[in-house]
Amino acid sequence: MGSKAIPFFSFILLLVLPLLFQAVLADLKDKKPSPFEFLQHLQGCHKGDKVKDIHKLKKYLENFGYLSYKNKTHANDDDFDDFLESAIKTYQLNYHLKATGTLDAGTVSKMMSPRCAVQDIINGTSRMRSGKKRNHPSGSKSVHTVSHYSFFEGEPRWPASQSHLTYAFLPGTRADAISPVAKAFQTWAANTHFSFSRTEDYVNADITVSFESRDHGDGSPFDGPGGTLAHAFAPTDGRFHYDAEEQWSVTATPGAYHLETLALHEIGHLLGLGHSSIEGAIMYPTFMAGESKGLHGDDIQGIKALYNY
């Protein structure tokens, strides 16, 4: 009996293995490489090196506000120069990494993280690592805290007469995104002086929400799955875009990005907040698939400081 079972088991394996192999191949085919994957083979690079794809690293840092070459020849070459080293040190300081100026493992890992497309540094003025000391009155004493929120250049904000804002979705927006975005607006309303209401008038709404892909005409193209996830513009522009090519989910689901979490972050930009260096803050720039976050004290302090209340 046992001897007959072995050939039968082998026969089943011969039938199943090709199917499993095809499933694995199909899964690999569906998984597109991250736009930031090029960073992996640059790990260990430092000043003085000349390595293929360093120009892509320069472009990455330029996109997020860390680097700007007057001479475009240097921007497009693969030389690890003084400017690049300085930009990497600034990036490392912003993300609480050791400021070595080299592409060590921790720096590469952080740079490869999916993130918001809004720059960390805008025209060289807005720094995540600001570490602003604030005094918060508490009875007869002042509570001393260090804040890490930031603002857009010039500190744009909604006028005092416009504390109620309307928002609208682009007609045809996926139905499962409506409730998470509405909840995100409700959360900000509960923690600020703002109130929000949904309108069907997309043209005249104060804030517009849509899913876009690649170059969509706003000067900030998306880059496909796993790179930049969403972006929004400073007051009083009002545009908020999700990357349509990402996997999105209403719940915190492995392999997908949480719609409400990213909405909370981008609404922060819509209200005037830049990025924070506090990892627990909603305004921290990077997000992982399956991650769910809420507002942090630093986010709320930032809005209160910007609007002076």
Predicted regions and their residues:
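Zinc-dependent metalloendopeptidases
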Residues: 2-309
